[in-house]
């Protein structure tokens, strides 16, 4: 059976390495795209709509990447996520801030199948808290939300039009490109779903938790293609997603058909309808006498179906030695010796 998850992973891998669609030498280089995005970021800073991070203020205009994970096509460039997008983490207000009706408050259980499912255990906060204490994490339609506390990491979803305003908790960050938002959000979702960058920066905490900090999120290394190539990548990935979804459905249909067929065959078998009866066959009662001369035959009358002529019913103990096992103490377990099977090994 085809592994659709591995197939999609391969598509994403090709996409982020610049191998899914051909490069066009006539495309405007990604370096020009990056400068246009930076210019928009500066405009937003001057207008007071966003703040310049302390790290960005100290950085030079030319980023240096000593540890880039792979080589890019000539027309691509590396950048940090915060070079092209506003990145902010959420937080959890006091219990008194939650209300029955108010501003939708997204929790990580609402990120289901890479979409926002706010109908699942919805929670709301007051307008005052949304526009006050939690104003930095106010979402907009089209923002990308990524969880930063796992396992699992890699839950990503785009804020839908059904949530014109919302907020979220501290287990996630929002990603809002400064320019070309729709196309870059789609591209960033493809890149981050590939998981290699997320896995490379994740740190393991207590009790098996896996985390990414806000700073790590802002500094994630992003390979940027030319804008036209970004569009081609998104279009190609979308085509493959449709194909993979169709394959998944076909596989599910086949599995359901196999399960139904197996059940039907077993049903026919136990009702004596799978193969024809032969009147010359020795009756089943003679077989039981040879297995256990002391067997007790059962009355067939309580069965909901007619037992074929030549068949007979009996209890399991008449033809099998049925025994139960005992629990083994932990001190009795050995690395070698007689195999001991538990229910989970069957």
Please place each PLM-identified region on the residue numbering.
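Non-catalytic DNA-recognition/assembly elements of restriction-modification systems
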Residues: 10, 19, 64-91, 227, ...
